[in-house]
Amino acid sequence: MKTFFAKFIVALFAFTYFSAFAEPVTLNNSPVRSFVQWYSSKTGKSVIVNPDVKGNITVFNADVNNANIDDFFKSVLNANGLVVVAGNPAVVSTPLTKLASQPSNEETYDDESDGVAYEAVPQSAAPAVPADLTVRNFNVTRVRSSDVLPLAKIFVDSNGGGNVVDYPGNNSLVVSGSAQVMPALSDFITSIDVAREQVLIQSLMFETSVSNGVDLSFALALASGGKVAGGFNTSALGTALSTAGGSFGIFNGNILALSLQAVQSDSNSKVISTPRILTQSGQSGYISVGQNVPFVTGKVTGEAASVNNPFQTIERRDVGVSLKVTPVVMGNGQLVLTIDTKADSLSNQAIASDIITNQRQIQTTVQIKDGQTLLLGGLISSNQFDSDRSVPFMSKIPLIGWLFRSHSDSKDDRTMFVLLTAHVIRAL
């Protein structure tokens, strides 16, 4: 009888103890952060929640007590793509499949440890941190650090990984990675930290009459019948420049000054522009002179809009002379020039309701030597001129008024040429 009474007392005490600490948990689409906050308040442990953690949790009728609350917490997070990994502080990483291929931190999980922090993060595992992680600043002295940044990233990624950040205020790169990679990275940055040559582009853009060309034979310092690169015969060069079909040549020496004098002294020729550009090798240089002209792109009147408030849309475009050159200095003293030159003008014709522009453009890529002059041309434009003259009052007399009026038509065909000289300015 005493034995039965003792067992009854023990069973009653156990039931009372379990009932006191067991708690049914039901979560219906509750936020993850609320679940983590509930766990922290029940256990008294610190919990860190990653800012990227989002989503909701659903749990139905789970009995949780002090003995299984940690397992319950981990199980719920795992079921929702989150996993608690022990540490000091503990870190939660995913995906679980990736964690399975690495040493499991859950083997050292200590349910009884106090002050352990848990971090809940989404399904993205951070890259492994090198054991000899170090941070170093590399100063770049001859080029921009932003130009070196892509190459430095490729080098670091191919040698164990790391992080490279551009510090433009100091023109330097801040690199974090393995200490073993830093010496090789320093040598690599030094090898590409080399000042680039600059190229001075001098140009003469001019136009001449098709019927009466300008004679540049003296300026080009070539005898009659001489040859230049490309097989361009300079016999009677003035006639050659006025011939339709274009011209091309590469000449030794800077002949722009003499050519400018020859064009200015010729009454049938006109200097359009003499642009000069200084730019680095591999960088584009651009210069433009002209007008910003409004062009009507749309108009709304009548039924499409209120008659009292008609409107039209206007787009402004640059009309004038522009030169864009991208030089690349080669190792053998050669230069590769990508040239885009344009000469636009407003037409005097009024056959449309909007503005008409005359366009002449040359786009090409050539290779010349340092100091040589390039001739491009053959862009012909035709201008039609109509003029009416009359004697006031007398021209309006019936029958004989035509004797005091005159009408003339004229046509002027002009060809545009471009002379371009490139000089390499060596880095100090």
Swiss-Prot record:
Compartments in which it is found: Host membrane
Enumerate the PROSITE patterns for this protein.
T2SP_D
The protein's predominant localisation is host cell
Q: Where are the transmembrane segments?
A: 319-339
Stated membrane topology is: Single-pass type I membrane protein
Which GO cellular component does the record give, naming just one?
Answer: host cell membrane
Q: Which Gene3D superfamilies match?
A: 3.30.1370.120, 3.55.50.30
Q: Does the keyword Transmembrane helix apply?
A: yes
Write the signal peptide boundaries.
1-22
UniProt keyword list = Host membrane, Membrane, Signal, Transmembrane, Transmembrane helix, Viral extrusion, Viral release from host cell
Entry's Gene Ontology BP terms: protein secretion; viral extrusion
Q: Which InterPro entries match?
A: Bact_Secretion_Sys_Channel (IPR050810), GspD-like_N0 (IPR049371), GspD/PilQ (IPR001775), NolW-like (IPR005644), NolW-like_sf (IPR038591), T2SS/T3SS_dom (IPR004846), T2SS_GspD_CS (IPR004845)
- Briefly, what is this protein's role? Acts in the assembly and extrusion of the bacteriophage by forming a channel across the host outer membrane. This channel is just large enough to allow a newly synthesized phage particle to pass through. Extrusion is a process of concomitant assembly and secretion and takes place at specific assembly sites where host inner and outer membranes are in close contacts.
Q: Which family does it belong to?
A: Belongs to the inovirus G4P protein family.
PANTHER family per the UniProt record, alphabetical: PROBABLE GENERAL SECRETION PATHWAY PROTEIN D, SECRETIN GSPD-RELATED
- Could you describe the subunit structure of this protein? Homomultimer. The channel is composed of 14 G4P subunits that confer a barrel-like structure. Interacts with G1P; this interaction results in a complex that spans the inner an outer host membranes.
Name assigned to this protein: Virion export protein
Question: Could you tell me which species this protein originates from?
Answer: Enterobacteria phage I2-2
Source species taxonomy? Viruses, Monodnaviria, Loebvirae, Hofneiviricota, Faserviricetes
